[in-house]
A protein has these predicted regions:
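Short beta-strand-to-loop acidic/aromatic patch adjacent to the donor-nucleotide binding site
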Residues: 83-94
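Residue-level detector of anion-binding/catalytic polar loops
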Residues: 55, 92, 109, 240, ...
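Active-site nucleotide-sugar/metal-binding loop of Leloir-type enzymes
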Residues: 72-85
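Conserved donor sugar-nucleotide recognition element shared by glycan-biosynthetic enzymes
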Residues: 67-71, 143, 227
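Anion (oxyanion) recognition and catalysis
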Residues: 50, 104, 234-235
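N-proximal low-complexity "stem/linker" segments adjacent to membrane-targeting elements
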Residues: 2-65, 69, 281
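Conserved catalytic core of nucleotide-sugar-dependent glycosyltransferases
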Residues: 75, 96-214
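C-terminal catalytic/acceptor-binding lobe
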Residues: 5, 14, 18-20, 24, ...
Length: 285
């Protein structure tokens, strides 16, 4: 269980000590599609980067169904530039630009945002109703998160404005410094690219480092996703991963809106009452 405290900032670099930053924004987009929420957030991020004087570049991966190859190709393209940071943002993530920019205030190698899973946490909704949470606030209590805290037992109290060490995080929102890939290059395998990339991230026969792959974790026999595999490889050589608990991210997905008319509560517009099939028709009596 995670208990968040709202307190003052800590661990933030002073302006004179901040290194020059140039960020490479990378988004895999299967089908070449992204959400409007992502687009709106990205435009605001661009304005925020310009206001801070942070140069940026962007690269997108279209129509690549294999997410491991998509991420590796984007990293391959990033390493050809002089950018200092790679920022993965998936095309179904909504974010606040100001909260994201706060990640740059901490000189950390790997930092990720924590976003909810694409499901409604009905247990949390029920609990919130019993606690008297107002109806207009219930949407803030519907999320399910996976937070992989490092070495904890029971309830942990952390500061909401301070990076939180985790053993793994999702690449749907992850900021990675260039030196991470440079160090991992010595320990991860390479493969020969045999896919035509219309976005120009990689050419045929390019040698691409496999930073992202699926793997089986020896200790638990779990199948690790590509982002957890990446985090494991980084931790194996002494690296650390941090989460940004101050970020409030949205994870856009599809949902079937359903219900039984006879069981729903009337809306403020006062829905008409529905009579059961065997009830007499008042108009005919």
């Amino acid at each position: 269980m995670l208990d968040l405290l709202k307190t003052g900032d800590d661990g933030i670099m002073s302006e004179e000590n901040k290194p020059q930053i140039k960020v490479f924004i990378a988004s895999p987009m299967y089908g070449g599609m992204c959400t409007g929420f992502y687009t709106q957030s990205l435009l605001k991020l661009q304005m925020g980067l310009q206001a801070r004087g942070i140069p940026s570049a962007m690269s997108f991966m279209f129509n690549e169904s294999l997410i491991t190859r998509a991420r590796n190709s984007l990293v391959h393209q990033f390493l050809k530039t002089d950018c200092t940071h790679l920022l993965f943002i998936d095309a179904d993530i909504r974010f606040d630009a100001g909260e994201l920019l706060h990640m740059f205030d901490h000189d950390l190698d790997v930092m990720c945002g924590i976003y909810p899973k694409k499901e409604i946490n009905w247990h949390s909704v029920e609990s919130s109703v019993h606690r008297g949470v107002p109806v207009d606030k219930l949407k803030n209590n519907t999320g399910s998160w996976v937070i992989n805290l490092v070495d904890y037992v029971g309830t942990v109290t952390v500061r909401i404005d301070t990076p939180l060490e985790v053993w793994a995080g999702g690449t749907g929102m992850m900021l990675i410094k260039r030196n991470v890939f440079e160090k991992l290059s010595d320990v991860v395998p390479s493969y020969r690219n045999d896919v035509v990339d219309l976005a120009g991230n990689a050419q045929i026969n390019d040698s691409i480092k496999e930073f992202f792959a699926t793997s089986i974790e020896p200790e638990t026999q779990r199948l690790l996703s590509e982002d957890y595999h990446f985090c494991r490889e980084w931790r194996k050589i002494g690296g650390k991963i941090y989460a940004a608990p101050w970020m409030n991210l949205g994870h856009v997905g599809s949902y079937i809106f359903e219900g039984e008319l006879t069981k729903n509560e009337p809306s403020p517009e006062q829905q008409p009452e529905l009579l059961p099939p065997d009830a007499a028709n008042p108009a005919q009596t």
